[in-house]
């Protein structure tokens, strides 16, 4: 697990590097599907002092199997998503400014241009709010459940992120670094959408044919973006 702990540590350290977190906010995890174990950031440990060996290993029930610290308080959310979507290899949660603003506004981040379409096939959805019962109960688990309720059976890697109403963004990917990459892009397109709608409140969504072209040339069966 040492290699995966190193990867998760490096991915967590990318969050302050890209300006996605303040203080100890945010967390990244990754899963070893063969072993049924998840590596995740410890709760409340400062990025400035954090080391790879500080990463916490939990099983799919959330029991700590390796590590000196308590795992992230959002661990149950991560585990619920891993259980539901086998294609996920890494998950990240932040409170990045612009994506969180859309979450607080209770609005999906609209697909307005090709930057968005290169990564997200359609709007980045916003969940419903959690009920008082859901918050007072197993809050973090129910956060995962409301994300799943919103995504349904859609392939999560086609829209690798979501904003949780009144909370903030979650993103995911094939591994921890891919999840952080998508979180960075989500923050950027959230900012772009806010600026674009401020300039033109009547702005329409990107044309579907243009969105399809940009997404499929990077992610479709006949993708040709980049090098083989």
Curated annotation (Swiss-Prot):
SUPFAM superfamilies tied to this protein: AraD/HMP-PK domain-like
EC number(s) reported in the record: 5.1.3.4
Molecular function GO labels: aldehyde-lyase activity; L-ribulose-phosphate 4-epimerase activity; zinc ion binding
Pfam families in the cross-refs: Aldolase_II (PF00596)
Pathway(s) per entry: Cofactor degradation; L-ascorbate degradation; D-xylulose 5-phosphate from L-ascorbate: step 4/4
One GO CC term on file: cytosol
Recorded superkingdom: Bacteria
Active site: 118 (proton donor/acceptor), 225 (proton donor/acceptor)
Cofactor(s) needed for function: Zn(2+)
Induction (record text): Induced by L-ascorbate. Repressed by UlaR.
Residues annotated for Zn(2+) binding in this entry: 74, 93, 95, 167
GO biological process, one term: L-ascorbic acid catabolic process
Keyword Zinc: yes
Regions crossing the membrane: none
InterPro entries for this protein: Aldolase_class_II_sugar_metab, Aldolase_II/adducin_N, Aldolase_II/adducin_N_sf, UlaF
Bound cofactor: record note: Binds 1 zinc ion per subunit.
Keyword Isomerase assigned: yes
Sites where the protein binds substrate: 26-27, 43-44, 72-73
Family: Belongs to the aldolase class II family. AraD/FucA subfamily.
Database matches in NCBIfam families: PRK08193.1 (NF006047), PRK12348.1 (NF009003)
Protein name per its UniProtKB record: L-ribulose-5-phosphate 4-epimerase UlaF
Source species: Escherichia coli O81 (strain ED1a)
Phylogenetic placement of the source organism: Bacteria, Pseudomonadati, Pseudomonadota, Gammaproteobacteria, Enterobacterales
UniProt gene name: ulaF
